[in-house]
Design a protein with these regions (language model features):
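Glycine-rich, N-terminal phosphate-binding loop of Rossmann-like dinucleotide-binding domains
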Residues: 24, 84-86, 238, 273, ...
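Short glycine-/polar-rich loops that comprise or flank the Walker A/P-loop
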Residues: 17, 45-48, 297-300, 321-324, ...
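A glycine-rich (often HGG/GG-containing) alpha/beta subdomain
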Residues: 1-143, 147, 151, 326
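Switch I (G2) and immediately adjacent beta-strands of P-loop GTPase domains
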Residues: 49-69, 251-279, 297-300
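Generic enzyme active-site microenvironment
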Residues: 270, 304, 327
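C-terminal-of-GTPase-core extension/linker across diverse P-loop GTPases
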Residues: 2-14, 53, 139-262, 279-281, ...
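Inter-motif core of Ras-like GTPase G domains
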Residues: 284-308
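Conserved G/P- and acidic residue-centered "switch" motifs that form tight phosphate/ATP-binding loops
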Residues: 120, 228, 272
Length: 444
């Protein structure tokens, strides 16, 4: 792929629409404007009304055009945006005309933002913030994406890198001047204190219970219990539709069924699972294993108990967590004696008690999302690099405390700096760039 290619794409929603935006970036914009726009190359950063024609002079449409010369543009290159009527025929004619010109092609997903990254206009976390704000469905997702897009995460990572650069400079004093009598003693203690402070800060960031990733990707609630306890009926009630098959036959649900919705201002994945019981059926047994895995990974577990015929062995077979919610179902029937302590009594079939349960679920998710203010980590990629960087910080501190050599400590600090640099995209990220930008829409 030549960096000299001029790229173009529809940057607005799919047609038909009142207005469409076609975006171009690259060094052939001057030639395109002269050949296809009646106004020629417009005055920079001014909306200019003009007629847009194809290579044969046929009128495509009349609309506005805005020219933003590089390097002071989103991509750092010359960019042009066409504001035309958003009908399919106009868009098809316009884009086919542009891409028929030599050196002009359709942009790949995220290519405009990738060029902005390569031009140093944004770093990798800010680029991810662009993708996240486009995909944001909730105010919480939007706020987190805006913070990332405007450099909120970068600021923290850059501060850590700056601190480590200062620490590295101090360690290298000891490496470069080993014969200075007081240098090691005067330098090592402050460096250890600085490393310890950084270790605590990174550990605190890693101890956020994944809230940043969950705000972005969704929290998970697992509905578990014995067969025929009403799990699928409750899922359908919470989903507002028939997402799961409901029958009176135990073991109907054999795989995990997930429903996505907003609760407590957050994206939530509700999982209906296979009934937990011993079974010789190979397919059902696999469903039980999947149910146990989903339960282990969930942010909240709902234990469904059949109020008429409770199977308490299910409650006893899984390690109980303080956040677990026990729900007695079939409250519209005569309840059996010996029910366990429960939090809510409902009839999933009729809906009695479900609004109160749903409100409790929303409160739990809302409180969990608010438990960490301004998370530093919003993607698994960030977390993995921080974990590796933290290991380097521990190794550097150990090398200094045990006296195994400042050279080893210096190398560990350099590695930690590289891990932090990989988060913002300043070093060693070629292997992840494709994955990051492929998640974007074409026109961004």
């Amino acid at each position: 792929m030549s960096e000299r290619d001029t790229i173009c794409a529809l940057a607005s929603g799919q047609p038909p629409a009142a207005i469409c935006i076609i975006r171009l970036s690259g060094d052939r914009i001057w030639k395109l404007a002269g050949a296809l726009l009646d106004c020629g190359l417009p005055e920079p950063r001014h909306a200019t009304l003009t007629k847009f024609r194809d290579e044969d002079g046929n009128l495509i449409d009349e609309g506005l055009v805005v020219f933003m010369p590089g390097p002071h543009s989103y991509t750092g290159e010359d960019t042009l945006e066409l504001y035309l009527h958003g009908g399919p025929a106009v868009i098809t004619h316009a884009i086919s005309t542009l891409t028929s010109e030599s050196g002009v092609r359709l942009a790949e997903p995220g290519e405009f933002t990738r060029r902005a990254f390569e031009a140093g206009k944004i770093d990798l976390t800010e680029a991810e913030g662009v993708a996240d704000i486009i995909e944001a469905e909730t105010n919480a997702q939007k706020a987190q994406a805006l913070r990332q897009l405007t450099g909120g995460l970068t600021e923290q990572y850059d501060q850590w890198r700056a601190d480590l650069t200062g620490i590295l400079a101090l360690i290298e004093v000891v490496v470069d001047f080993p014969d200075e009598e007081d240098a090691p003693e005067e330098t090592t203690a402050p460096v250890i204190r600085k490393l310890t402070r950084l270790i605590h800060e990174v550990e605190e960031a890693l101890g956020d219970r994944g809230v940043g990733e969950k705000i972005r990707d969704g929290f998970r609630i697992a509905i578990i219990g014995a067969p025929n306890a009403g799990k699928s009926t409750l899922l359908n009630r919470l989903a507002g539709r028939d997402a799961a098959i409901v029958t009176s036959t135990p073991g109907t649900t054999r795989d995990v069924i997930e429903v996505r919705r907003v609760m407590g201002g957050q994206i939530v994945w509700l999982s209906d699972t296979a009934g937990l019981r011993e079974t010789q059926d190979e397919i059902e047994a696999e469903g039980v294993r999947r149910a146990e895995r989903v339960a282990a990974e969930a942010d909240l577990r709902l234990f469904m108990v059949d109020g008429g015929a409770p199977e308490l062995g299910v409650l006893n077979s899984l390690f109980r967590q303080t956040t677990d919610i026990v729900v007695v179902n079939k409250a519209d029937t005569e309840l059996a004696a010996g029910l366990p302590e429960y939090d809510y009594k409902i009839s999933a079939k009729d809906g009695d008690g479900v609004p109160e349960l749903e409100a409790a679920l929303a409160d739990f998710i809302s409180n969990k999302a608010a438990s960490v203010e301004a998370p530093v980590i919003t993607r698994a990629r960030h977390r993995a690099r921080l974990v590796d960087g933290l290991a380097c910080l521990f190794a550097a501190r150990d090398a200094l405390e045990l006296g195994t050599g400042p050279e080893l400590a210096a190398e560990d600090v350099r590695l930690a700096i590289r891990h932090l640099g990989a988060i913002v995209g300043s070093v060693g990220v070629e292997d992840v760039l494709g994955a990051v930008f492929s998640q974007f829409c074409i026109g961004k």
